[in-house]
């Protein structure tokens, strides 16, 4: 038997040892105000071992949004699960996946995210920096089975959107240079090649192909680290991490659909 003091030291040593080998996980809940003025809760999770971050929230109309940043592959995924309009012949829900490159300044590293701790979850958070809206032409379809080459998370995040996974030609060119198999990509019809292809909101027939648009906004994301300056006794100035900076970022995706029936929400925009 260990003496009491030795037992405590032994248990503390085990905690330290296991803490070195187990992945560092974080789960934060942030209350934010959506573009329509309603409140929702963002759930942010980070896995520093697998090096990715997810952000999830539900919009006022019931749409469920998942954003995933894969730092190992420099890829981000937007998954949108939209409730269908049953009275107009749609299925119970419709899933979309948008896959594109992850830029270096979009969100803090997973290791930094995993170190954040929950503070005052009932306070409504407002982003410190407004980064505007990116308009993305998602003119290429991704084969679900082969998409794992881009990021293994596609099979988990986009399982409900196997026939609706989109990316951009400019991203495809970069991935091809990196040796990604080009057979997973299919260039979709565009108005430049088919003049009769119009935006879905201008298309009068539900069965005609058109260019659909979908807008979403991430109201609060930890986009960068804050650094403070410290001056020591030798009057030497050093910098150290002292917090995070939050940002708001919106996206508008334009993509081809085989019939307007798959883009009924565009009538309301």
UniProtKB/Swiss-Prot annotation:
InterPro entries from the UniProt entry: Oaf, Oaf_C, OAF_N
Superkingdom to which the source organism belongs: Eukaryota
Signal peptide region: 1-26
Cystine connections: none
Stored Pfam families: OAF_C (PF22873), OAF_N (PF14941)
Keywords: Signal
Entry keyword Acetylation: no
Family per similarity comment: Belongs to the OAF family.
Annotated protein name in UniProt: Out at first protein homolog
Source organism per UniProt: Xenopus laevis (African clawed frog)
Name of the gene this protein is made from: oaf
